[in-house]
């Protein structure tokens, strides 16, 4: 295994921030929401006050009713971004005349298709309407609504609207979260944007970010792919704003004003780590001295939820009811990483790090939060199912532990360290990750 040279720069984390279902990430606000019942009174008060501001609540954050509302409208819960009880759908149907004669109807002339079906006969009624006689059956799509079989997701706190915080101009939700998340991370360093940028030469700062899913809502790829099928036109923004590397482009253009290197590396749930690896490799080699790195995802849209559901990856409501032997789906407990579970839960978030080399961090007086000495990501080799677990997880953990032992010694590794579980909530992950962590 390659070891880290004692002469190479050490990547240090000098800022982090973003937004996720627990709230604002900087200064551990989101983490405190996760463990809020175990905090002392002062920290609880501060956490509730922060969330109340984020959620634009008018009530006093000290009030028990307001606090219960905050608890109920953060973390994993029933989907609020769209109505899971009325998901738009199209049902295909074949229309036939009841008396076996041709089908006759009229429509506005401007709504006629560009290619007239061969079995249609057209008669102009007036300047605005046309009568159509269809000699055979007519295939149509009927607007419909369905109840989603998955109604749980991790969503940013209710009331938080990233689009209201800047001139969003119909930006996809993932990019709206990017602007907030990256801004939060950069401001957490204590440096103004200009100060951070001026610490180094323009080619010594870079931004690495991506989105595994890309932007799939109606303001990006969702609109690009769906609009022609529902009688609308794609817009000039749909294609460009859907690109997976767009979060990094937004940071460069809207926040940092950087002309330095940029890249977007994509890798499913390891996308964030792929970009962190690129960042630390550049810092250790001396090519970069400041790197802003992050990931932004907004997959809580009906077609993405349905796509993961038909894979068998998500916890469906009926499966959760069966686990609890209940007639009611407990949306709050949809994700159960190391328990009896049925699948993972989609969530939206935008999380960012600001990394510096150790010399620059000391010279600039930056607040040092920790180091990121290495990142390991391994493929699984031959396997029958791409989504299934494989040997790569074992190699990744083994190399990470060897790196920690090399840096800190075996005693610290065994007695002074901890492992943060992946914990997706899928039955396969429950088995393989439990085996690795044992």
Where do the PLM segments sit?
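Short glycine/threonine-rich loop-to-helix capping motif typified by GTGT followed
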Residues: 381-393, 423-438
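Conserved catalytic cysteine-centered active-site region
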Residues: 4, 129-176, 214-278, 311, ...
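Condensing-enzyme catalytic core mediating Claisen C-C bond formation in acyl metabolism
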Residues: 7-17, 21, 319-412, 417-418
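Short acidic, glycine/serine/threonine-rich loops at helix termini
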Residues: 218-222, 275-277, 301-307, 366, ...
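Active-site-proximal alpha-helical scaffold in enzymes
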Residues: 177-191, 244, 248, 262-297, ...
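ACP-dependent fatty acid/polyketide chain-elongation machinery
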Residues: 1-167, 359-371
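Hydrophobic alpha-helical hairpins/lids featuring a short glycine-rich hinge
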Residues: 175-235
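Conserved small-residue
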Residues: 182, 207, 272, 279, ...
């Amino acid at each position: 295994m390659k070891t880290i040279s004692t002469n190479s720069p050490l990547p240090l984390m000098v800022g982090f921030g973003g937004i996720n279902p627990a709230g604002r990430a900087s200064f551990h606000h989101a983490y405190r929401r996760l463990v809020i019942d175990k905090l002392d009174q002062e920290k609880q008060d501060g956490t509730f006050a922060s969330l109340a501001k984020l959620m634009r609540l008018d009530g006093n954050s000290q009030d028990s009713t307001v606090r219960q509302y905050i608890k109920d409208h953060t973390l994993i819960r029933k989907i609020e971004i769209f109505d899971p009880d009325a998901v738009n759908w199209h049902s295909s149907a074949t229309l036939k005349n009841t008396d076996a004669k041709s089908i006759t109807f009229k429509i506005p002339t401007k709504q006629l298709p560009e290619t007239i079906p061969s079995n249609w006969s057209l008669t102009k009624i007036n300047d605005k309407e046309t009568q159509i006689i269809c000699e055979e059956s007519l295939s149509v799509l009927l607007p419909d609504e369905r109840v989603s079989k998955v109604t749980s997701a991790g969503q940013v706190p209710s009331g938080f609207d990233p689009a209201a915080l800047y001139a969003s101009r119909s930006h996809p939700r993932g990019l709206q979260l990017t602007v907030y998340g990256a801004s939060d991370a950069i401001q957490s360093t204590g440096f103004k944007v200009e100060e951070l940028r001026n610490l180094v030469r323009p080619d010594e700062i870079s931004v690495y970010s991506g989105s595994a899913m890309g932007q799939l809502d109606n303001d990006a790829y969702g609109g690009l792919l769906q609009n022609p099928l529902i009688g609308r036109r794609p817009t000039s923004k749909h294609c460009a704003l859907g690109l997976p590397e767009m979060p990094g482009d937004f940071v460069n253009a809207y926040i940092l004003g950087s002309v330095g290197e940029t890249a977007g590396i994509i890798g499913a749930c390891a996308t964030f780590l792929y970009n962190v690896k690129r960042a630390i490799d550049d810092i250790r080699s001396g090519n970069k001295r400041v790197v802003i790195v992050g990931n932004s995802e907004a997959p809580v849209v009906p077609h993405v939820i349905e796509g993961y559901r038909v894979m068998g990856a998500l916890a469906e409501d009926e499966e959760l009811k069966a686990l609890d032997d209940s007639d009611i789906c407990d949306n709050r407990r949809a994700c159960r990483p190391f328990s009896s579970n049925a699948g993972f839960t989609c969530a939206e978030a935008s999380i960012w790090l600001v990394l510096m080399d150790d010399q620059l961090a000391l010279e600039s007086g930056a607040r040092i939060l920790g180091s990121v000495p290495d990142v390991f990501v391994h493929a699984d080799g031959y396997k029958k199912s791409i989504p299934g677990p494989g040997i790569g997880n074992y190699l990744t953990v083994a190399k990470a532990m060897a790196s920690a032992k090399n840096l800190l010694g075996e005693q610290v590794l065994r007695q002074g360290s901890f492992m943060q579980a992946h914990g997706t909530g899928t039955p396969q992950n429950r088995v393989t990750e439990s085996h690795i962590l044992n």
